[in-house]
Regions:
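ATP-binding N-terminal substructure of ATP-dependent carboxylate-amine bond-forming enzymes
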Residues: 1-126, 138-146, 179, 396
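ATP-dependent carboxylate activation and anion-phosphoryl transfer catalytic cores
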Residues: 6-26, 48, 71-73, 89, ...
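Alpha-helix initiation/capping motif
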Residues: 59, 84, 112, 137, ...
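Conserved beta3 strand of the protein kinase N-lobe
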Residues: 133-134
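Acidic/histidine-enriched active-site and ligand-binding environments that engage anionic O-linkages
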Residues: 147-156
């Protein structure tokens, strides 16, 4: 097992990793920018190191500063959390070059899944169903129109190096294709430094379903059920739940088995999530995230497995915590991402939290690093915290969520709490009858 882990992140995920380390008896090092000097994970860690000014590129993305922090403190492993350097294959390789353990997958798998075109080819080879589309990048010399006609309009133009909804454009008709290609390519170039794009069939009203996996890197891999992340705004997840209200037991078992088998063949190491669009009973691979996800608590609540703790244990050479047969999905869980944003315009609302009360009771969990008097800095994402609830049934879970949302107090800044209080009372949400465009259509109706 590792002796000391440096947590190369901030906010709630840094605190989440710190908790797992403490339960394993591992010493912790928090790193922070000057803007995060008063952060909760900095207060609770055994040691802390300031790694630079507020801007992420000068602090949390500053690899030399992180290496120096490891050397100063004697850390033997680095946990990257999510975001920042968590899916940076070069960072994993640099750590290995310095005899440091990267708590995550092998660098080759991070690189493979980071290239969306190669990821899709690999998924197809491993027997994972994929969205019909171009076999690779579509360049100026390719017959984009011919490919699009073969797929069938509408088509989606996507950045090969994309993520977070950037570099994605829909061409509803042949007339839209040229503009969609140039716009997506330009966006991709400015956001990711890579202008290459590819084409996929555009599904009209799909759900977004992802499968959580855990691999030991030696050919052992299991799946821990699915999460439904269909409630999204601008391709950003807002609400996640598991099991998915859209799936039946047979579909769940079939896709889970397919994915686990693929991860065994890949010899995947650690936690990972395979994301799918789901429409008319069919799954279509979108991408694989080779890190812990923001919404991992949903799976923890319904499987009773500590994913971050197991991620650390497996990175240190440990075995899988259970066989596939021992994994039992218990009850239902929902997570709401509460952001420091105006609930109507979604403008960021950084500032000082004057009052803070976290809801409690059976089956209620808050993953947050904020406290009364804490100042949310304007430099990073606007997550205040994640409210996660569990119930024996989805109906019980919704009632518990409604109660917890009404109980939660965050004053001094604007938050998206009012949005969730409204959503949890919406008939479509109560019925579990929603798709990835539902929330944006709902919001458009509210402001009309």
């Amino acid at each position: 097992m590792f002796d000391k882990i440096l947590i190369a992140n901030r906010g709630e995920i840094a605190l989440r990793v710190l908790r797992a380390c403490k339960e394993l008896g591992i010493a912790t090092v928090a790193v922070h920018s000057t803007a995060d000097a008063d952060a909760m994970h900095v207060r609770l860690a055994d040691e802390s190191v300031c790694i630079g000014p507020p801007a992420s590129k000068d602090s949390y993305l500053n690899v030399p500063a992180l290496l120096a922090a490891c050397e100063i403190t004697g850390a033997d492993a680095v946990h990257p959390g999510y975001g920042f350097l968590s899916e940076n294959a070069r960072f994993a390789e640099i750590l290995a070059d310095h005899n440091l353990h990267f708590i995550g997958p092998k660098a080759e798998h991070i690189r493979l899944m980071g290239d969306k075109i190669e990821a899709k080819k690999t998924a197809k080879r491993l027997g994972i169903p994929v969205v019909p589309g171009s076999d690779g990048g579509v360049g100026p010399g390719d017959d984009a129109m011919g490919i699009a006609n073969e797929i069938g309009f509408p088509v989606l133009v996507k950045a090969a190096a994309g993520g977070g909804g950037r570099g994605m454009k829909v061409a509803h008709t042949p007339d839209d294709l040229a503009l969609a290609l140039s716009t997506a390519s330009n966006e991709a170039k400015s956001a990711f430094g890579d202008a290459s794009v590819y084409l996929e069939k555009y599904l009209q009203k799909p759900g977004h379903i992802e499968i959580q996996v855990l691999g030991d890197g030696r050919g052992g891999a299991i799946h821990l059920g699915e999460r439904d992340c269909s409630l999204q705004r601008r391709h950003q997840k807002v609400w996640e739940e598991g099991p998915s209200p859209a799936l039946d037991a047979a579909s769940r078992k079939k896709i889970g088995t397919t994915v686990a088998k693929a991860m065994q063949e890949l010899k995947y190491l650690g936690v990972g999530t395979i994301e799918f669009l789901y429409e008319d009973g069919e799954f279509y691979f979108i991408e694989m995230n080779t890190r812990i996800q923001v919404e991992h608590p949903v799976t923890e609540m319904i499987t009773d497995i500590d994913l971050v703790l197991e991620q650390i244990r497996i990175a240190a050479g440990g075995d899988l915590p259970a066989t596939q047969e021992e994994i039992v999905i218990n009850g239902h869980s929902i997570e709401c991402r509460i952001n420091a944003e105006n609930p109507v315009s979604f403008r960021p609302s950084p500032g000082k939290i004057q009052q803070f009360h976290a809801p409690g009771g059976l089956g209620v969990r808050i993953d947050s690093a904020v406290y009364q008097g804490y100042v949310i800095p304007p430099y990073y994402d606007s997550l205040v915290g994640k409210l996660i609830v569990h119930g024996k049934t989805r109906a019980e879970c919704l009632m518990r969520l409604r109660r917890a949302l009404d109980e939660m107090v965050v004053e001094g800044i604007e938050t998206t709490l009012p949005l969730f209080r409204a959503l949890v009372r919406e008939p479509a949400i109560i019925d579990g009858d929603y798709h990835i465009h539902w929330l944006e259509q709902y919001l458009a109706g509210q402001t009309a």
